[in-house]
């Protein structure tokens, strides 16, 4: 969906960081078997996509900023009319050059024989060890061959550096075209959540709600969910990453849905919790109001200069106050934070980066300190309370209640812009959306 110039600009920015003496080798993962001879749907490695827009498996990108020729080299699957009848069209070598910006393109099968020359005589090799055993062996073999060739003027790189440090810094700061994709993903996701609220009444199964959500993603032009859709009814909502989605929704249940559409490889990440009956009970309303007030105040805090740690600390304090008011905890707020007892009911972080990956890349610290938010960063804000059905020493009417409210924000010069504002979260708006 992006113009080739977008990917060219990204490569230029990354190669500027590499410098003329650096060479980067980046590999997509191969297709993975699901079972038998059936494969999982392939999704390109986010780093490779960010730099190329190329979506086929078995791809290797080599960047050589200081080279006079072959600065951008791609190893790809060749065109094969017979195979393409079965598995779909390929870009091939010409497509890699004409469409994806490669100066030179070779077949994936040629990588073992050509890699050593491409990395020769560079000071630093930027390569991520430990991600792909086969690729580690290829790179190791190339370096070993160069060590044997030093007397003939072909020397190996002096150091191996992880390219993700520099590349993920670029990915952390979203460009305008990325925000367009994220806004679209968020808009579609909001539509899917509202549709789920209307469907998810007693007697409907969790998997029916999941099916409607994923259908809405695809119908609106998304590629599908950016991660496994969570539909947790009743006490299933107290399981953070519940993805079985097999239970029938019962009268009196709350339904927690955590779902995000992927659009143009960028994913949204929204959580909403709503009453299957269409109206919150008094107990559900009390817990929901605690989470909602906490979430809204944290969203209001998010601006340049504030850290994710500060957002989390704020939510911990606000939720702990609520836990005491609800009768979940006793003592003072400071005592319960100091001994971490609050983690019985709020055990996860408040925010994470969002982008090509649902838990997107980028360091949360700089020079040992929490990193301040800056314009162009996209984050989630997602506090919650999870009261297990067998939780001891808590009011009986609160057991089995799980509530999370999550929005996606882009940090701006003036503060933040909530990308998911169209998704209902106020009690009256949620109940209105649930009306059938």
Annotate each language-model stretch with its function.
Residues 1-436:
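Active-site neighborhoods and metal-handling regions in enzymes and metal-associated proteins
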């Amino acid at each position: 969906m992006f113009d080739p110039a977008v990917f060219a600009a990204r490569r230029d920015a990354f190669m500027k960081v590499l410098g003329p003496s650096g060479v980067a080798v980046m590999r997509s993962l191969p297709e993975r078997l699901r079972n038998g001879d059936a494969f999982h749907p392939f999704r390109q490695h986010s780093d490779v996509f960010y730099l190329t827009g190329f979506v086929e498996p078995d791809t290797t990108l080599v960047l050589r900023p200081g080279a006079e020729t072959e600065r951008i080299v791609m190893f790809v699957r060749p065109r094969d009319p017979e195979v393409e009848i079965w598995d779909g069209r390929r870009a091939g070598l010409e497509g890699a050059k004409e469409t994806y910006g490669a100066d030179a393109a070779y077949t994936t099968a040629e990588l073992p024989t050509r890699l050593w020359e491409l990395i020769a005589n560079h000071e630093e090799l930027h390569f991520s060890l430990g991600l792909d055993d086969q690729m580690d062996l290829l790179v190791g073999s190339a370096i070993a061959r160069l060590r044997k060739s030093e007397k003939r003027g072909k020397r190996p790189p002096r150091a191996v550096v992880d390219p993700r440090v520099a590349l993920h810094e670029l990915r952390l700061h979203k460009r305008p075209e990325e925000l367009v994709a994220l806004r679209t993903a968020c808009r579609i996701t909001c539509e899917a959540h509202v549709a789920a609220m209307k469907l998810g009444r007693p007697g409907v199964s969790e998997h029916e709600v999941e099916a409607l959500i994923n259908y809405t993603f695809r119908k609106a032009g998304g590629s599908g969910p950016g991660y496994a859709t969570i539909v947790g009814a009743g006490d299933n909502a107290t399981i953070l990453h519940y993805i079985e989605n097999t239970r029938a929704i019962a009268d009196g249940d709350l339904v927690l849905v955590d779902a995000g559409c992927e659009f143009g490889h960028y994913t949204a990440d929204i959580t909403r919790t709503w009453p299957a009956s269409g109206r919150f009970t008094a107990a559900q309303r009390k817990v929901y109001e605690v989470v909602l007030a906490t979430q809204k105040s944290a969203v209001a805090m998010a601006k340049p200069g504030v850290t994710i740690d500060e957002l989390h600390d704020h939510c911990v304090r606000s939720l702990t106050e609520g836990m005491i008011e609800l009768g979940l905890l006793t003592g003072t707020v400071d005592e319960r934070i100091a001994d971490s007892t609050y983690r019985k009911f709020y055990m996860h972080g408040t925010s994470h980066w969002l982008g090509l990956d649902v838990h997107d890349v980028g360091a949360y610290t700089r020079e040992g300190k929490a990193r301040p938010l800056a314009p162009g960063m996209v984050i989630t804000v997602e506090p919650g309370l999870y009261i297990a059905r067998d939780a001891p020493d808590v009011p009986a009417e609160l057991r089995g209640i799980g509530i999370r409210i999550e929005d996606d924000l882009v940090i701006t010069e003036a503060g933040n812009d909530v990308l998911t504002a169209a998704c209902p979260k106020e009690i009256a708006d949620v109940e209105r959306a649930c009306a059938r």
